[in-house]
């Protein structure tokens, strides 16, 4: 790509100190985010998705530390930021929607005041002007009767409405980048679709770039322009949404795609990924996914694969792409995935 990224993470490493031991949660992750795009970071729980992206807003837990790499934003390395530096970035330029809206909201404070605080802090509005902006934001995220709702508390809102409030707080300052950490968890399918459409509408109106953190490839298909797949603290494959769904190469990506709901034979066992992710307290030798991969190559257990370029926009960290490797066939269930998704009405990506 000729265009310049607005965030460029290079070889980022993050280590946590736990009970006197070191846990390497992120292992040399590199990722670019471009202006106006929607990037999905997908993987199992514990893969490092949230930890990695929290570095973009300076919100690592106190026992976590960036121990390698760089994250460039506006020509500055965010790994070197002080808390004073973050005050001009967090919320104002890069905002984050957390997974659980109930824990993101103060139960003792009225909803309107919580949105108003964000506006006062980052936009410099005060009094009636800030209140008016907060009410307008409630209306913008689809909350009916915003003047009345402004005076209510979080417990008076449904889960879907609370998520709209959290999105309103994040978007109130018109950030350049919005990070959404599992924004539709625990919401029913209808509300999930409404929340995704809301974020899409706000992105278009405000010109934001959006990062989705999710384990749900169904969400990815609906929202993403590009996808990065994470496993055991590493990005193992990245590409456009079409490349990841229809031309994936990493065996972990294959396993995730196999777990997509499909029209199958009645009584057929649902696919699962055998085994468990590696213990990140221990040094990982070779390909981290090899012990769970039924078709692992001998080299997978002894040497970590590099990234092999599939196209200008697509690369995968797997020995399967080495010219010397035996030819590997994709699992039968994800062959002709374009046709199968079309039959289920899910072939139209990102909209």
Say what each PLM segment does.
Residues 66-77:
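Conserved ABC transporter NBD signature motif
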Residues 77, 129-148, 257:
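Conserved ABC ATPase "signature" region
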Residues 4-5, 144-148, 240-345:
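Short catalytic/signature loops enriched in Gly
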Residues 58, 179, 183, 187, ...:
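P-loop NTP-binding/switch modules centered on Walker-like glycine-rich loops
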Residues 172-176:
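A short, proline-enriched helix->beta-strand linker immediately N-terminal to the Walker B motif
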Residues 42-44:
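The feature captures the beta-strand-to-loop junction immediately N-terminal to the Walker
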């Amino acid at each position: 790509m000729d265009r310049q990224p607005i965030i460029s993470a290079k070889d980022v490493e993050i280590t946590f100190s736990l009970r006197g031991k070191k846990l390497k949660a992120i292992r040399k992750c590199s990722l670019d985010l471009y202006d106006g795009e929607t990037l999905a970071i997908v993987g199992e729980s514990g893969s490092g998705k949230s930890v990695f992206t929290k570095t973009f807003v300076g919100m690592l837990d106190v026992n976590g530390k960036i121990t390698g790499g760089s994250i460039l934003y506006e020509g500055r390395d965010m790994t070197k930021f002080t808390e004073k530096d973050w005050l001009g970035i967090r919320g104002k330029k890069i905002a984050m929607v957390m997974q659980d809206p109930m824990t993101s909201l103060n139960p003792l404070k009225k909803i309107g005041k919580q949105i108003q605080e964000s506006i006062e802090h980052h936009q410099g509005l005060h009094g009636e002007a800030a209140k008016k902006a907060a009410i307008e934001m409630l209306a913008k995220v689809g909350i009916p009767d915003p003047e009345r709702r402004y005076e209510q508390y979080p417990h008076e809102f449904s889960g879907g409405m609370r998520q709209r409030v959290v999105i309103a707080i994040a978007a109130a300052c018109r950030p350049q980048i919005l990070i959404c950490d599992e924004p539709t968890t625990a919401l029913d399918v209808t509300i999930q679709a409404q929340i995704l459409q809301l974020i899409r509408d706000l992105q278009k109106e405000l010109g934001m770039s959006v990062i989705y953190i999710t384990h749900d490839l169904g969400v990815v298909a609906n929202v993403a322009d590009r996808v990065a797949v994470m496993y055991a603290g590493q990005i193992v494959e990245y590409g456009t949404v079409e490349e990841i769904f229809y031309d994936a190469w990493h065996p972990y990506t294959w396993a995730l795609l196999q777990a997509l709901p499909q029209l199958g034979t009645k009584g057929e066992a649902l696919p699962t990924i055998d085994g468990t992710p590696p213990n990140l307290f221990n040094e990982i030798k070779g390909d981290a996914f090899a012990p769970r991969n039924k078709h692992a190559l001998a080299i997978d257990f002894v040497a970590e694969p590099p990234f092999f370029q599939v196209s200008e926009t697509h690369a995968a960290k797997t020995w399967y792409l080495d010219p010397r490797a035996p030819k590997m066939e994709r699992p039968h269930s994800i062959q002709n995935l374009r046709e199968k998704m079309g039959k289920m009405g899910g072939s139209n990506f990102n909209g």
